[in-house]
A protein has these predicted regions:
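Periplasmic c-type cytochrome electron-transfer domains
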Residues: 2-11, 19-21, 28-464
Length: 464
């Protein structure tokens, strides 16, 4: 699949579409299957057994895993699920990005402003000449036209621009990668190669929504004014989003702080039973939920728990417990999307980013005196089984738990914690540092941890 070069400034690289990726990956699996183990599948890690030759059934499973991975990655990175009908056609967000000089409205959004909003640029989509001009500072990052060029090159992570033949932007849709990928900053801060699964804690989703010219779609469903919608989303801040707003209409907590929650990572989730901060369901439940109800894609979603006028009045008004679309742009993609997400392991911290000796002592505390491993069971770091706890058990208020069907908080899987220290910890970032989390547990569970022990625990958490 080749994306054509339209812009004189930025060229779209050859995008490795499904068939290309598939072919490459199939070759690499065949390499393992036929080359390394002479006709055998790779043996299980600890197996002392002789591996028998691969059967047709074994081979077909291995080939399916390659296909699922490639398709799922394509969906995670590039599928909008038809969400352009909401972000473009209804909210007209593309017009605000373009600005009046380019067929839109207002001043437009420059690349520098987009980077300030936490949007990321995928350098694999840019030709070397553009990367050089970025590094030498000669590419104009203060012109909304360059933003449009980047969108045309499919280089803005998680955002897809649609253009007509006159190169005018006509709509815009969003992808999973918007919130759950970032980049490695290899070219410049905010510009580099993709890191799938990392929560984008720089992304100011609320500020992006707030610049949309027409928020009537949200205002109508929430039964408030557009100004109120703007005030609610402007209060979210970087790294946060409120997936429950369009279910219960609650924009703020009782203490008047935003009701939004942090964007969690979407890696290290294999083996974890329930997902999201409040354990709404499995990974695939949430994938269907978010693509239909939050991204405003067009698919099928069924969850009768939402048909609860007391807890979810907005969802009931909008009929969100039983969504059907024709054509269904989501359901056929859910299996591979699930598979891809489970394949994303939590990234290991680099050497030297934590103190190894202290981490080793912290590990003993985690399993022993501090009692953490009772809930954060290694190596999943959540409970195998029903990984949910009442607000009282962990010593916090019930506001966010009450916005979900189970009324509980899910034990966060802790691997890769080092990647998401920005924005704080716990669902709403209430603890600014890991040390603050440990202080909370020290008080709540009466642990009598010494200062040195707390430091060791922090080092252990940073090593996961
Ligand atoms: C606008 C930002 C945004 C987009 C787009 C988005 N998510 Fe999320 N995602 C979130 C937030 C916020 C949460 C936490 C929700 C909660 O607890 O209420 C979350 C939670 C999750 C979780 C649970 C993680 C865990 O720790 O259990 C998964 C899995 C996930 N999202 C996958 C996806 C997939 C797949 C897509 C695309 C179909 C997607 N998300 C699109 C913001 C987003
Ligand atoms: C009773 C079960 C339980 C015990 C014991 C427990 N935790 Fe937790 N932990 C949770 C739950 C539930 C959450 C999610 C809270 C939230 O998001 O509001 C959590 C969240 C966390 C987080 C934040 C993760 C994130 O992504 O923001 C850290 C860090 C953490 N726990 C570390 C520890 C440490 C260290 C200990 C031992 C001192 C410990 N926990 C003991 C249940 C537990």
């Amino acid at each position: 699949m080749i994306a054509f070069h339209i812009s004189p400034v930025l060229k779209v690289g050859v995008r490795a579409g499904p068939s290309y990726v598939l072919a490459l990956m199939a070759i690499s699996v065949m390499g393992i299957v036929t080359g390394l183990h002479s006709g055998c599948l790779p043996p299980p890690v600890d197996s002392g057994r002789d591996t028998p030759p691969a059967s047709d059934a074994d081979r077909s499973i291995a080939q399916n895993s390659v296909k699922m991975l490639a398709e799922g990655r394509e969906t995670f990175r590039f599928d909008t699920f038809g969400s352009e009908s909401f972000w473009g056609d209804a909210l007209k967000l593309h017009q605000a990005l373009a600005g009046s000089a380019n067929g839109g409205v207002g001043p437009g959004v420059t690349p520098n402003q987009a980077l300030q909003l936490g949007l990321k640029v995928d350098s694999d989509m840019l030709i070397p000449a553009v990367i050089e001009s970025l590094q030498s500072g000669t590419l104009n990052l203060d012109d909304p036209l360059t933003t449009l060029d980047l969108l045309r090159a499919d280089a803005v992570v998680g955002v897809k621009g649609f253009f007509d033949q006159n190169r005018t932007i006509t709509s815009i849709g969003i992808q999973c990668a918007l919130c759950h990928s970032t980049v490695d900053d290899a070219v410049l801060p905010g510009i580099g190669r993709r890191l799938d699964g990392w929560g984008n804690r720089d992304l100011n989703v609320g500020a992006i929504i707030a610049i949309a010219p027409d928020l009537s779609a949200l205002a109508n469903v929430l039964q408030v004014t557009q100004d109120t919608v703007r005030a609610v989303v402007n209060a979210w801040g970087p790294g946060k989003f409120d997936a429950e707003l369009t279910l219960d209409g609650k924009g703020f907590r009782p203490d008047n702080r935003t009701a939004a929650t942090l964007i969690p990572p979407a890696f290290g989730l294999a083996g974890v039973n329930l997902h999201t901060w409040t354990g709404w369901g499995s990974v695939t439940h949430w994938n269907a939920f978010v693509s239909n109800l939050e991204m405003h894609g067009h698919g099928t979603f069924f969850d009768p728990r939402l048909n609860d006028p007391v807890r979810f009045p907005v969802a009931v008004r909008a009929g969100l417990h039983d969504v059907r679309s024709n054509p269904d742009l989501i359901t056929p993609k859910l299996a591979a999307l699930h598979f891809y997400q489970l394949a994303i392991a939590a990234p290991a911290p680099a050497d030297g980013t934590f103190v190894r000796e202290a981490a080793r002592r912290g590990e003993s505390l985690f399993a022993g005196k501090a009692g953490c491993a009772r809930c954060h069971v290694p190596p999943l770091f959540t409970e195998p089984g029903w990984n949910m706890h009442t607000p009282d058990e962990i010593g916090i208020d019930s506001f966010q738990a009450d916005r979900s069907p189970d009324g509980r908080y899910r034990t966060s899987p802790l691997k890769g914690l080092w990647t998401h220290q920005k924005g704080g910890f716990y669902h709403d970032g209430r603890f600014p540092t890991l040390r603050a989390v440990i202080d909370h547990y020290d008080g709540h569970f009466d642990l009598s941890l010494s200062e040195a022990e707390k430091d060791d625990l922090v080092q252990y958490l940073l090593s996961l």
